[in-house]
Amino acid sequence: MPELPEVETVRRGLQPVLEGARLTRVEARRPDLRFPFPERFSERLTGKTITALGRRAKYLTMHVQDGPVLICHLGMSGSFRIETDDDGETPGVFHHERSKSTAHDHVVFDVVAADGARSRVIFNDPRRFGFMLFAEGSPETHPMLAGLGVEPTGNTLDGVLLASLLKGRGSPLKAALLDQKLIAGLGNIYVSEALWRAGLSPLREAGTIARPSKKARQQSERLAEAIRSVISDAIAAGGSSLRDYMHTDGSLGYFQHSFAVYDREGEPCPKPGCGGHIERVVQSGRSTFYCRTCQS
């Protein structure tokens, strides 16, 4: 499933085409994805100007003038692609063959920019776990977004805040970090990478780094910094291309080439002087990768 860096990469890819453009045609080619499309879906968007394209956690938000806010989730395999009048490959940009059948093109947005340039934005989702819903008013009050926790970007998430979120929690540290009500947008890949950078075991009790001790304060600060840096690095690399994820132009993200532990079972730990090896364990049905030698 695309995580926050992948969704942010998609947002940045769509933004130049969608923001300020007018929706001249909106076509939903089936009645539902994971959920049914909102009533009068096409009618309520057609003719509207897109004022902003935002992101909250793993959700995209499309704001239109005098209309509802469209909330979109990519699900397991959802992706957008952009088609223009000039669809030649951009020099210097890596492209790969699309493996997805156009039979899974479920939503089409035709837009015209202020300068008259026309584009088509297509949502493709083979597994149909993605969805599009309307928020009337602020999207922050929509049930899908209302309970989300702090964003792991910028400097909001620091050691003090992280310790307050984890205080008293007896669940494994990795499980607590995946709780979207605490920190919004973190997923399996980047939690594993952040815990390795911070030198903390995913198996340890979450509340142990929130104790009133110097060591715990250092651990919470180290983990907060690791979370922020992993997310920032992944966004800069365009996300991680695993299985279904691709950019809006069909190119791949590259952060997977920087993985220290994720999907590297049996390999030597890359931390200098460690000497350990990456192990895989299953937590709550998900694979966890870590080094027991340098993560405690």
Curated annotation (Swiss-Prot):
Chain residues that bind DNA: 104, 127, 169
Pfam families cross-referenced by the UniProt entry: Fapy_DNA_glyco, H2TH, zf-FPG_IleRS
EC numbers, comma separated: 3.2.2.23, 4.2.99.18
Zn finger limits (FPG-type): 260-296
Cofactor note: Binds 1 zinc ion per subunit.
Functional description taken from the UniProt entry: Involved in base excision repair of DNA damaged by oxidation or by mutagenic agents. Acts as a DNA glycosylase that recognizes and removes damaged bases. Has a preference for oxidized purines, such as 7,8-dihydro-8-oxoguanine (8-oxoG). Has AP (apurinic/apyrimidinic) lyase activity and introduces nicks in the DNA strand. Cleaves the DNA backbone by beta-delta elimination to generate a single-strand break at the site of the removed base with both 3'- and 5'-phosphates.
Sequence similarity: Belongs to the FPG family.
Protein's UniProt name: Formamidopyrimidine-DNA glycosylase
Taxonomic source organism: Mesorhizobium japonicum (strain LMG 29417 / CECT 9101 / MAFF 303099) (Mesorhizobium loti (strain MAFF 303099))
Gene that this polypeptide is encoded by: mutM
